[in-house]
A protein has these predicted regions:
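Active-site loop-to-helix "anion-binding N-cap" substructures in soluble metabolic enzymes
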Residues: 1-256
């Protein structure tokens, strides 16, 4: 299976942005802007916007994701949301292990693994984020680190479950900084992700895996990044908050 036969996915990660009122306005602009997309379009929104997003996107080509999920099904975990709660709302995707969760909320490779398995068990499609800091890149350990992150995240995930997994390479030094990995840097790490998945699950499984790039992808650099053979889509932060910018990236994925 080559790139043309893999599912390209452009996912917007709204982070802690947009009230329910603001979400309605943005989604109203997004629906016509991406209606002719040749790739899968996902918006991952704050918990408070999920109901609005699911209701407004019914009958459209936009899929809805959450930005976090807890690893337990239920119980005394004040403030947490389970996979069953999300799927019951009509949510399809969930972001797991974003660098901001790792940096500010003590997310670890082990909790990423627990959340991934809980998401899959609950019927969600996890978008697992992996990536290195600037120090780690300068030390030359990027591939070693990313391989470890992928292996731990997928520990206990079956080959059948892997079909519902997306992995996003997001270099931490490029998140919200305006800095972007070059297309060649992105390709190198995305190819390494596919390689380690091939070692774990076989070449066919690796060829079928959607690997995204996340890290200041924008309308100006999207086409070059998405033209690379192992970059199948993007996890988009700031540019996902503006319908016109997001639509340009979606169009680039359609061409890519």
């Amino acid at each position: 299976m080559d790139k043309q036969n893999r599912k390209a996915i452009i996912a917007g990660n709204w982070k802690m942005n947009k009230t329910a009122t603001e979400a309605k306005a943005l989604i109203s602009e997004l629906i016509p802007a991406v209606k002719d997309a040749g790739c899968e379009v996902v918006i991952c929104v704050p918990f408070t916007d999920l109901v609005t997003a699911v209701e407004m996107t019914k009958g459209t080509n936009i899929h809805v994701g959450a930005e976090k999920v807890h690893f337990e099904k239920s119980g005394a975990f004040t403030g947490e949301i389970s996979a069953d709660m999300l799927t019951d709302l009509g949510v399809e995707y969930v972001v797991i292990g974003h660098s901001e969760r790792r940096q500010y909320f003590a997310e670890t490779n082990e909790t990423v693994n627990k959340r991934t398995k809980a998401a899959l068990a609950g019927g969600l499609k996890p978008i697992i984020c992996v990536g290195e800091s600037l120090d780690q890149r300068e030390q030359g350990v990027t591939e070693e680190l990313v391989r470890m992150q992928v292996k731990i995240a997928l520990n206990g995930v079956t080959a059948d479950e892997l079909k519902n997994v997306v992995i996003a390479y997001e270099p931490i030094w490029a998140i919200g900084t305006g800095k972007t990995a070059t297309a060649d840097q992105a390709e190198e790490v995305c190819a390494a992700i596919r390689k380690v998945v091939g070692e774990l699950y076989g070449e066919d499984a690796a060829k079928g895996l959607t690997v995204q790039y996340g890290g200041s992808m924008n309308p100006k650099n999207a086409e070059e990044l998405l033209s690379k053979p192992d970059v199948d889509g993007g996890l988009i932060g700031g540019a996902s908050l503006k319908a016109d910018q997001f639509a340009v990236i979606v169009d680039a994925a359609t061409k890519g």
